């Protein structure tokens, strides 16, 4: 994505989380706005220089974008954000900075207080978000990786245990203690991924050449494994990280990626097999344990999607067309997503109950989408749900321009969608 990149957004925007400059839902894809970047001695020569978009994540009403700027020495990673910040999920000064202006609807660099708390020399290299909470992985040479959390703590989302006071919750950020997961004497501890559902969090770690998996937050449906109260009833939520054990030994077959729905969690192993935890009430786990050769995974709140050499498969609820095939059902068995054209899936992203797919068809890159569309998040100009995949980029009005504007990445959130277009 070295060429100048345009970020387009559609969908739910009540708190300005699309960064379109206002707080109206966008029913068609609209450019996201970036604030002008302050120039410093380490900044690129021009604030208009297009950065590389590393990732986009979002909660219920806030968005984080991890950007890489290239200067004369090395790439510089920054976190930009927009939307709702009342719980501190966008940093302690975010709301004060935007008071009286409409800057909550524009992406701007977040002022995060690491150095004020003694964390000097750390670089953010990964971000994640659940409903009203944000997570930042901090890395420094020859030090253990640090996981910081900030924002709301419903269902223990912050991962800091039973907070003894409101003052602790109002701290600018928190350090998630993972030492009991890997052991206090472990060396070379790296956090390789942080994945969230609406209210549960899963972390992949490596320490001393071994893999560990930890999680916290909502747990009632087994999405963190079988956690029980002394009474034998399911633990509603865990406010502190717990070890997640999988049926497949991760030391022999490590986990490459994790995705989370509302009440389920899915793990892709190096062998191409899948482990799954949590609720199957909507059929969201159907067929996963016998799948082979899986290349990529993702989850909506109540569904699971796997990419195989044979194509994109889906399982779970199809009440709003989420599975990309016509039969409507609150619970459907695993089957293929039915593109009406010959399609090679290059990338795909699941939102709360909708899906975007970047495909190659007849030598052209296009974005197709389907599922729940109440906020216009599929960018069709309509609020009607979409039962089978339809092309959403490029739209007919810009077909000729699209010959020089190529979709390169897609992301999806809670009723929100993003497309990165390279010119």
Residue ranges of model-derived segments:
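Eukaryote-biased RCC1-like beta-propeller repeat architecture
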Residues: 1-423
């Amino acid at each position: 994505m070295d060429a100048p990149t345009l970020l387009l957004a559609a969908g739910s925007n009540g708190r300005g989380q699309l960064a379109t400059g206002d707080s109206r839902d966008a029913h068609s894809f609209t450019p996201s706005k970036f604030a002008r970047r302050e120039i410093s001695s380490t900044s690129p020569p021009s604030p208009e220089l297009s950065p590389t978009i590393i990732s986009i994540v979002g909660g219920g009403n806030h968005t984080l974008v991890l950007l890489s700027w290239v200067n004369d020495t090395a790439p510089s990673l920054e976190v930009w954000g927009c939307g709702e910040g009342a719980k501190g999920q966008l940093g302690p000064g975010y709301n004060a900075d935007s008071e009286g202006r409409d800057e909550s609807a524009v992406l701007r660099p977040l002022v995060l207080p690491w150095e004020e708390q003694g964390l000097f020399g750390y670089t953010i290299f990964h971000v994640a978000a659940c409903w009203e909470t944000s997570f930042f992985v901090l890395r420094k040479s020859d030090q253990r990786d640090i996981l910081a959390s900030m924002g709301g703590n419903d269902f223990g989302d912050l991962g800091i245990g039973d907070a003894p006071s409101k003052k602790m919750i109002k701290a600018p950020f928190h350090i998630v203690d993972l030492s009991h997961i890997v052991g206090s004497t472990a060396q070379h501890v790296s956090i390789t991924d942080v994945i969230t559902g609406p209210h549960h969090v899963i972390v992949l770690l490596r320490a001393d050449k071994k893999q560990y998996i930890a999680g916290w937050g909502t747990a009632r449906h087994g999405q963190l494994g079988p956690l029980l109260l002394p009474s034998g009833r399911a633990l509603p939520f865990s406010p502190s990280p717990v070890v997640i054990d999988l049926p497949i030994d991760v030391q022999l077959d490590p986990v490459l990626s994790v995705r989370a729905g509302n009440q389920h969690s899915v793990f892709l192993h190096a062998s191409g097999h899948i482990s799954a935890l949590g609720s199957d009430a909507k059929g969201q786990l159907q067929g996963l344990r016998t799948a082979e050769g899986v290349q990529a995974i993702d989850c909506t709140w109540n569904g699971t999607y796997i990419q195989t050499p044979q194509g994109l498969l889906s399982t779970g609820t199809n009440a709003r067309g989420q599975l990309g095939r016509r039969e409507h059902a609150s619970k459907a068995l695993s089957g293929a997503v039915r593109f009406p054209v010959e399609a090679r899936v290059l990338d795909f992203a699941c939102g709360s109950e909708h899906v975007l797919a970047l495909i190659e068809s007849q030598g052209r890159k296009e974005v197709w989408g389907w599922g729940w569309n109440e906020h216009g998040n599929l960018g069709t100009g309509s609020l009607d749900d979409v039962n089978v995949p339809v092309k959403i980029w490029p739209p007919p009005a810009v077909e000729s321009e699209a010959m020089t504007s190529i979709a390169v990445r897609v992301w999806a959130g809670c009723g929100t969608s993003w497309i990165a277009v390279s010119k």
